[in-house]
Amino acid sequence: MNRLRRAFPSDRYTPHGYLDNPGHSWRLNRSGVVRTTGRIGFAWHFPSYPGPYGKRWVYSAALEIIPDQPENRPFCDHHTKELFRFRQGEWRVEMFLGEEAIVALVAGPPRWPVEARATYRRQVGVSGDWDFGLLARQDPDGPGHLAVYAEGTAFVLLADQPLAGAVWTSPDAEWPDRTQPIEKSIAQRFSLPDGRMTVVLARAESSQAALERARRAIDRAASTRRRKLRADAAFWRGAPRLEGDWPDHWRRGLVYDLETLRQIVRPPGGVYRSRWDGMQIQVPRVVLAETALDMLLLSYADPATASEVVLGTFRDAIAPNVPCTREDGSVNMVAVDGQACGTSPAWCWPFWCLGLLYRRTGDRAWLAELVPHAERFLDWWLAHRRHSGGAPFYLCGWESGQDASPRFGSAERGGGGIEAIEPVDLDAALALSARLLAGWCAELGRDGARWRRAAADFAERTARLWQRGWFHDRTEGGPTAARDPMQLAPLMCRVASEEQVAALRRAFADLPGHAGYTPIEWPPVALTALESALQAGAADWAAATAAELVDRVWRVIDAPRHEPGRPLPGVAHEHWPPEGDRVPSGRGARNGWHTEGYGWGATTALLFLRYVAGLRDDPESEDLTIEPRLPLALLRPGARYRLLNLPWRGQLLDLSYSVTAEGGLALEKSWSRR
């Protein structure tokens, strides 16, 4: 393989995003997240970045490198969960996390001035410590200290070069105002004889311990850097990338998505014996729906990790229904009657995701280990979420994944009260899941007859929900009035008749919204709509819709500057508001793009690869077909688009799309060993 193809794809990336803090979890070790500052710099945010998850904020502590070139905007040519390489004029700054220290390797013109600035910002009185204020002091021999009086997390700013000068915040003259965050900072100035310096901001629960960590971080900086770059190379040697005439923000957008997915995979800990999917980086937890979708997305680059995470999620679950849990085994989705809930077979389509993951690897040993867990999961739903007449139900909106959806009307109380509704998507999902299980049993030489019967039963139940040209949820009083894109599920699950498919094919021109939102701004709902369109023969609509969405979302997260009212670039987000890059007023002003660093926000990668680039694998088939549908704007005669390094069953697939003089597409394929 070409050596460049084994490396991270260098480019002009946004200087915004997150470094991975592998020690961060939510019950056993709240360690915080590491987010860019808007300059060349990173900040710890503890216990997480304040937002929809983890609203309680205690402190932030930032290390920023300020070269003497303010007229040049920084960018990154290396942008991964492990390491950011900032460029600003003639300066290069590599930043990464070394245990409990933010490390910066600075390189610039000899003897040019540069500043290292540390800023500690804290909301006193919320941590439970005896924190009454902050202090800043500078030692004559180099270390700068930022700490709390009387107790609390301390930081040390330390470089391996002598100081040319330093300034720091003066001591408090009186008790600070505890109703507002307080701030202290130290700015150290350097004039580097050879233009190189290592500077760190280390933390600990005392200044002395922080100083010891700072010294170790400097001593180990070179080896830590090598380890980080090796990890990046190991991932990217088998990960897809875009080359050629693709839009710049598409080329980089795929990278941001894949790096977000890398970052939400957490190391083993607590009840999880293998790596696990944290769903999002701020307040990690295991949710089957997000795990299945996230790992399907990650399997386009790292199928081995995806397979490990999915299997471990089922194996280490505290109950067959895979309740939503933290790493210590505590549950965090309890209904009003006290039941610990997990997400359903319909939310993010876990069995569909498992089927595609299996087809991508062909790993029958993995399938043999997975199937008993998958059977227990589906058995649980058949035993605990069906009425005596056979109708399935959700116990609560949380279990459906569709919190407070109008489909559930006044019965929805957030945590329960919707048991009387037979949901279309659940019937269809049970039919699909049982059918897939039957197929997997057949491949393993096991009897799958009971799953074939269950699949037929739920397919028949789904058919009975067809009313007035649409699949409607039902109660004892008859069909409900609410329409929702999730009710297209019979198309995605292949349980709709030809007549029903033909009738619904016309619906894609004017889809109903979802829970007060547009039909494609929440990733799982967008996936349901687009895959249903594909199965209904509306592939052109699916491709055009996916391309428009991908273009908009990737343009936003590739922005070179983070401006007020816009989502942070460089990372995937939970939600894709249709208003585009600005947070709208009213309801959207509260929600915006929601959580930063959310795995399913990277579903744009799947939408691009499956519906635009045309990679069509099938959970019920060995086939991989390629049917690209590029948007009209890309069909410029002579343009060439390359999609490289796609893993498929131990090999890497390269695709080249060339636009002919007539505006058509010529496709070339080649394979190499992984």
Short names for language-model regions:
Residues M1-H249, A289, Y300-A301, Q535-W541, ...:
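Terminal accessory carbohydrate-recognition/targeting modules of carbohydrate-active enzymes
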Residues R6-A7, L444-T475, Q500-L652:
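Non-catalytic carbohydrate-binding regions of carbohydrate-active enzymes
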Residues D257, D294, P490:
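Conserved hydrophobic/aromatic pocket- or pore-lining residues that grip, position, or stack substrates
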